[in-house]
Each structure stands twice: as C-alpha cells, then as structure tokens.
C-alpha cells in the first residue's frame, strides 16, 4: 500500500526535474531575434541622429535637407525604391488608420448587447416620458410670474391673450368662451 504513493512521488519528481533541466531552443531563438532587432534599431537611430544638426556650427551651415520617401508617406503607392541612408523615416501609427473615419459616425461607449438594450430603453423612456411637463404653470409664466427668461419665452399669441384677458372689458361687450376660460385659469 505504501509503495503506490512513493512511486507516484518518485515519478512526479522525476518528471518535474527532467522538464526543468531540459533546454528549450525557443529561448535561444527569441534571444537571437531580439538581438537582431535591437542592433538594427540602434543602427537606424544612430544614422538618423547623425543627420540632425548637433552644434552651433551645424546650425550656421544651413538647415539639413530631409528626404521623404514616397513609401514612407501614408496614402502613397508602395513602390520599391533604393533606400537613402540619411532619409527621414515617417512612421504612421497604427491607430491612425481607425481615426480616418468620420468622428460623428462612430458611437462612443460599449458595443455589447446589454449596452445596446440599455441605450434603446433610455431612448424609449425619453420619447415616451409623459410625466415630465416642459411648460411651467401659467401662474409662473405670466408677466407677474418670476424670471425674465420665462416672460421672454412666451409665444406671442398667448402673451397677447394674457394681456387682453387681464384688461377690464367693457361691460356691454359679451366675452368669448375662450376669454372666459382664460380668465378663470388666471384666477386659480
């Protein structure tokens, strides 16, 4: 009975130590690629930095002439040309490709189904919200009410009626039903 756990422990340690001591060539290949990339980048930066003026004598000599290759410029055709050693390299960032679209067409926020449902429910609530009343009560909108903006935002027709309904009418002239309704509303 004790032999089975001991054998399993022995096989597990053998597998663990055997895998740990085995050399993988993946790390060596990665190191080679990394060194090659770092070396080419260092050469490129050295070449570019030597083309820029570094001292006062270089600035007095005149501006350095920079060459822009057609394949470096975004949107141009990719024609193979000989590379010029002192050419300025224009790099186009990857995210600029997505920024070319018109900003107004792109919606911000998440694009999950739940967010879409929430946005739709919010729009439906805004369009069908009957509880809100965008108009203040008549007693507040009247010229005796508060706020210059409210008095200014009155429609001209209702402003004329309001002024006419408050003016004393001649006792002999019968009032129209609309004027009577407005007069009772103002009294309330």
Swiss-Prot record:
GO terms for cellular component: cytoplasm; extracellular space. Residues 1-21 form the signal peptide. It holds the Pfam family Calc_CGRP_IAPP. The modification Arginine amide is found at residue 41. Disulfide bonds join 110-115. Coiled coil: none annotated. It is found in: Secreted. Residues 45-92, 153-188 form a propeptide. Residues 131-177 are annotated as: Disordered. The modification Tyrosine amide is found at residue 146. Keywords: Amidation, Cleavage on pair of basic residues, Disulfide bond, Hormone, Secreted, Signal. The record marks 116, 125 as: Required for CALCRL receptor interaction. Transmembrane segments: none annotated. GO terms for biological process: adenylate cyclase-activating G protein-coupled receptor signaling pathway; adrenomedullin receptor signaling pathway; branching involved in labyrinthine layer morphogenesis; cell population proliferation; developmental growth; G protein-coupled receptor internalization; heart development; negative regulation of vascular permeability. It comes from the Eukaryota. GO terms for molecular function: adrenomedullin receptor binding; hormone activity. Belongs to the adrenomedullin family. Numerous actions have been reported most related to the physiologic control of fluid and electrolyte homeostasis. This is Pro-adrenomedullin. It comes from Sus scrofa. The lineage of its organism: Eukaryota, Metazoa, Chordata, Craniata, Vertebrata.
